[in-house]
A protein has these predicted regions:
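Bacterial N-terminal signal peptides that target proteins for export
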Residues: 2-20
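C-terminal segment of classical bacterial N-terminal signal peptides
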Residues: 23-33
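Sequence/structural segment immediately N-terminal to covalent heme-attachment motifs in c-type
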Residues: 37-47
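The canonical Cys-X-X-Cys-His
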Residues: 45-55
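Outer membrane beta-barrel
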Residues: 59, 89-110, 120-252, 269-274, ...
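Short cysteine/histidine-rich metal-coordination sites, predominantly Zn2+-binding motifs
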Residues: 61-75
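Short Fe-S-cluster ligation motifs
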Residues: 74-94
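Outer-membrane beta-barrel pore domains
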Residues: 165-168, 172, 285-479
Length: 479
């Protein structure tokens, strides 16, 4: 691939990376030509901006490429036509400095002595750190047979398969029939795996993973990758898209258990189902819009069949669902995304009551909640993006109204980030990111930044407010 040569300014930036980490919050980035994600750039010779709003987020052309099974629908698609030295792999990791803080936490009166009483207080910590590492293999095995395998580790190099699937594309010579089997991300309204924000409190979508207080449903949320099969289709420009997936009720875990290697949580021998429909259209000089709807419906066990006291498989399965809608608007340098979700867990799941023990009390009910997010991105150039997001979740019905106040678990979160790419070439890319996120929740911690407690555990009333924040400076790179 003929890529653009780095300018002298870019060379100086690369040589001065340590100083840039400290100065990144006030740097004024100079626009540079942006190229592609390495693996596919080397294969097709296209600039990164052809497929990406900003790596790793896709634009509509990139969505079409992905929907086609990582194919441009030309003579370069089959790997047999590529140079033998071509290998479809990308490695990504993020060295970083971050600070995490939360109030109304349990603080021992005498440090090191948990028996000497405690009081509510604020806990903070900061320092240099690493993200996990992704080793991503993806491409085509043959014309119209694509694959992805993504071994992913945490900060301590403990690996798991984030995804691993094979997809048969354009069945019966039509883009409306594509079949995938394995472990994969659901076709969500907004992909969490391509999220640009990375901080402890801002590096995920809360509504994709929310579980009410004391809820026993083992389902981790629609943001978790799942094991199963998917039928999907789209028109030529992916303005009209659909997916339907049938999934094992394992929350993405292998081995027919709900927790990796934990025999105490076997699967419920049921299937879950997910569907998503999306329609895009031009708005006559006002950009491009997409609207859509989605739903996840499943069952989870409330007790287990045992053998000599050892749980073998789940029984007493009860239903739950997540359903909602989306709206996205691409206009000039702006991208606005919004997602709404309504959640429901059956009363037995929500209260952790085995369904073979009798009836529920008069105060025990199904858990219901509503939430979502609104995110805006200002795309100054393909190398410089500013992101802001507001998220909210509100309980509409608690599982047990006799003990849990109605607003317990409600949250509001705000995240703002600045992401600048000094370079992105066909062999490697680098992004400097500065980010701040803030979360307020009622009664119970819903944050992701490293602290967690109930207000009552910290000696406060159930209706206290827990606030947490994350400050993040990172160097996100792939090659």
């Amino acid at each position: 691939m003929n890529s653009h040569s780095p300018s002298k300014f870019t060379d100086r930036v690369v040589s001065a990376v340590p100083a840039l980490v400290l100065l990144a919050a006030v740097l004024l980035p100079a626009p540079q030509p942006a190229n592609a994600i390495p693996a596919f750039a080397r294969k097709y010779g296209l600039p990164c901006s052809a497929c990406h709003i900003g790596w790793p987020e896709l634009n509509n052309f990139g969505q079409v490429f992905r929907d086609n099974g990582y194919q441009m629908m030309n003579e370069r698609d089959s790997p047999i036509t590529r140079d033998p030295s071509y290998f479809p792999i990308t490695i990504r990791i993020t060295p970083q400095w971050h600070r995490e803080s939360a109030n109304n936490q349990i603080v021992d009166n005498s440090p090191g002595n948990g028996e000497g009483g405690s009081h509510p207080g604020t806990l903070s910590t900061s320092g240099f750190d690493l993200s996990g590492m992704d080793i991503w293999f993806a491409g085509t095995l043959y014309k119209n047979i694509s694959f992805s395998a993504l071994p992913s580790s945490d900060q301590n190099a403990s690996f798991h398969f984030e995804n691993a699937f094979v997809r048969f594309d354009n069945l019966l010579h039509t883009p409306w029939l594509n079949f995938k089997v394995g472990k994969f991300e659901l076709d969500l309204p907004v992909s969490e795996k391509r999220l640009l924000t990375m901080s402890g409190d801002g590096g995920f979508y809360y509504i994709y993973h929310f579980t009410p207080l004391n809820d026993a449903n083992p389902f981790g949320g629609i943001g978790d990758n799942q094991l199963g099969m998917e039928l999907a289709g789209h028109n030529a420009n992916s303005y009209t898209r659909y997916t339907f997936a049938a999934l094992s009720s394992l929350d993405g875990n292998p081995g027919l258990v709900l927790s990796n290697g934990n025999p105490a949580n076997p699967a419920g021998r049921t299937f879950d189902y997910y569907g998503h429909f999306e329609q895009g259209f031009n708005t006559f000089g006002n950009g491009f819009m997409k609207v859509g709807a989605y739903s996840y419906f499943g069952f989870a066990p409330t007790f287990f069949q045992t053998s000599n006291g050892v749980p073998i498989y789940g029984r007493g399965n009860k239903p739950f669902y997540r359903a909602g809608a989306e709206w996205k608007w691409y206009f000039n340098k702006w991208l606005v995304k919004s997602v709404y979700l309504h959640g429901y867990d059956n009363a037995f799941l929500a209260n952790g009551v085995p369904s073979n023990t009798g009836t529920l009390s008069a105060t025990q009910r199904a858990a219901k909640w509503n939430g979502g997010f609104l995110e805006g991105q200002y795309i100054i150039s393909p190398q410089w993006i500013i992101i802001a997001r507001w998220e909210t979740i509100h309980m509409s019905q608690q599982a047990d109204i006799s003990i849990t106040p109605g607003d317990t678990g409600n949250l509001n979160a705000f995240t703002i980030a600045n992401r600048w790419y000094p370079f992105m070439f066909s062999r490697a890319g680098l992004a400097l990111q500065q980010e701040y996120s803030f979360v307020r929740s009622n009664g119970v911690t819903n944050q992701g930044g490293g602290f967690g407690t109930l207000c009552t555990d910290a000696g406060r009333a159930f209706n206290c407010t827990i606030s947490s924040s994350s400050l993040f400076f990172g160097i996100d790179f792939d090659f």
